[in-house]
Amino acid sequence: MGLTSDEAKIIINTLGRNPTEAEWLIFEAEWSEHCSYKSSRAWIRLLPSKSPLVIRGSGLDAPIIRINNIAVTFKIESHNHPSAVDPYDGAATGVGGIVRDILTTGLRPIALLDNLHLGSLDNQRSLWLSRNIIKGISDYGNRIGVPVVGGETWFDESFNNNPIVLVTCIGAGDFKRVIWGEGKVGDLVLVVGNDTGRDGMLGSSFASRELSSSDDIGAVQVGNPLLEKLLIDALMELGERGLVKAIKDVGGGGLATALSELAHQLGLGIEVDLTNIRLRDELKPEEILVSESQERMIIVVDPSRLSYVEAVLRKYEVGFDLIGKLTNDGKFTAYYKGIKLIDLPLDLITNPPEPIRKYTEPVYLMRLRRIPPLPSVKFNEALIKVASSPNLASKEVIYTQYDYEVGVRTVIKPGRAGATVLRLLEEDGGDGKLGIAVKADSNPRYSYLNPFTGAANSLAKAYRNVASVGAKPIAAVDSINVGNPEKPDKYWYFVKTVEGLTWMGNALGIPFVGGKVSFYNEDSVTGASIKPVVAVAVLGVVNDYAKAIEGGLTGEGWLVIIGDTGPELGGSEFLHSVHGLVAGEPPEPKPLSEVKNANLVMQLINNGLAKAVMDVGVGGLAAALIKMSIIGGVGFTVDLSKAPLTQGLNDPVTVAFSETNARYIIETSNLKETVRIIEANGVPYGVLGESGGGIVQFKWGGLELASLSVDDLVSINDSLRGVI
């Protein structure tokens, strides 16, 4: 049993009796870290969550953001433990689960993003995990007709046995289509979708402890994307016709969690008969409760509309079971073949005790934060190593496995810019011009060296990416993935992460409208913990998606850097790929500069002065320029000494690879007007050089640092092809 002895005592004392076997399983599921957030909820309440655009924030399956007459929702989820045991099904069902969370709002899922944190490419098990995770996402996403339009892929040896698999889903539709979640006593409760089987048994409990072995494969769910597609279509019609009052995904914890949370959210009770549930396998009633078989949802309907609901479900060949009704007693009551199995107060089920966890900074960090003296390195050799490193290499071999254009909404495709841009259609309630941009970012090395700074920088990076295409950032969701919360030096990472997100969110004016916390990302045999993954997805609004800007050079302009560059190599890709180090203090977060510089970039884009824009992040100025060159197939000549430098910086290698925040590269054909606007905004800038031709050339004053053809650069950057 996944409950502590203290938790078991609380349950027995509150009930005044010993729970039944079925009741124990409900508590094990609902009081797990995965479902209850018992070790994190006190901290995540600190995150800023309010904005005039946020109609409903975190706490339910998915938030609601209003943009004029359009409702937009987005959410991020993790599927780490299942993907470590069965990578194909673990990743695939991660896609299915997040799509169903979006469906609970009544809005159509329109796009997916994946953030993958995978192990070393020279480790055979890690390579096997990576290939199957990517294939699982590809197969499921392609078959349900929801495009995978963007993402991020990190490689690090700490993810060899414990990959971090995150999926974000975006939904949109007319604001009038939103299903807010209502119900009254006597309303009927149905399970719709898949049959209930043995797969995913107590998966929530499995996800709330350290990984052990492949013996846990029975806790991994198995997906059916074709059924999910039918479920999407059926729920869209039910919502459009106003036949559904509330929807709840059957996810972690199975029916035990879904039914109890739904009734509690409605402020009512619920009574169900498990005898009525279709089974794929022969199951005990207790197993029916905690099975996490996929493609299942709970819907609440008015009794007078049941026949219409049944007709729609039959039309799409989606199975359904009428299992119960809402009551006024505030209890979860369940029967099986006439025997009462469950009689529990919902307030007890849904309010587990919150343990007070100790936290302390790991002693090894003091040593790691000092960068040792570095041997000298030739600029061109460093450039090639950084450009070919797995983290900066082209991810084309990954995203071309995904269908990213289905649905006719994708304006800026994967690999073309800092963020993906999607058009909102007139059927969504828009004017045919409105669009949204979205990007999710993380940096495990930053978060490992300093979780406060790492978290703040994850939000800042996603904020810059969204601004770089011309979108105004309006909201964020986060996914925090760390080790065992019972270990003070691991829980410290979580606490400092939340503090960093809170600080930066308040400073940028960005509300967090949802998120996910995943603990126990450790190998129980070795005790090794992952580098913390703090992924932040930022959503932005584009008033006219036709004005959104890609990152590829056109060869028709000057290259201008916006923002200061300082000597900030801590946690950088340069240190790791060239010197084999993860050390130093990550770049200082600069929220005031982030806001000021982002507003300037958006102004330049809206005024039609930017031909191409790329924010500066991992790999520094050199990496940003390389990306722009490869995307556009165009060369450039730049003088790095022309960048605005701070702290007496005069080393070309540091200037090229420093990862100082709040910086962008702009290509413009109207240098005079661009400079006028930049100077009017009081933002540091430098004119680095020009784009054009087929050669990439870096200089420092009159000294040539490196020169290579764009074709050679493309080959160097394509280092993952044939590997993953």
UniProtKB/Swiss-Prot annotation:
It catalyses: N(2)-formyl-N(1)-(5-phospho-beta-D-ribosyl)glycinamide + L-glutamine + ATP + H2O = 2-formamido-N(1)-(5-O-phospho-beta-D-ribosyl)acetamidine + L-glutamate + ADP + phosphate + H(+). Mg(2+) 1 binds at residue 77. It is an enzyme of class 6 (ligase). The keyword Cell inner membrane does not apply. Substrate binds at residues 78-81, 100, 221, 292-294, 518. GO terms for molecular function: ATP binding; magnesium ion binding; phosphoribosylformylglycinamidine synthase activity. GO terms for biological process: 'de novo' IMP biosynthetic process. One of its GO terms (cellular component) is cytoplasm. Monomer. Part of the FGAM synthase complex composed of 1 PurL, 1 PurQ and 2 PurS subunits. This is Phosphoribosylformylglycinamidine synthase subunit PurL. It comes from Caldivirga maquilingensis (strain ATCC 700844 / DSM 13496 / JCM 10307 / IC-167).
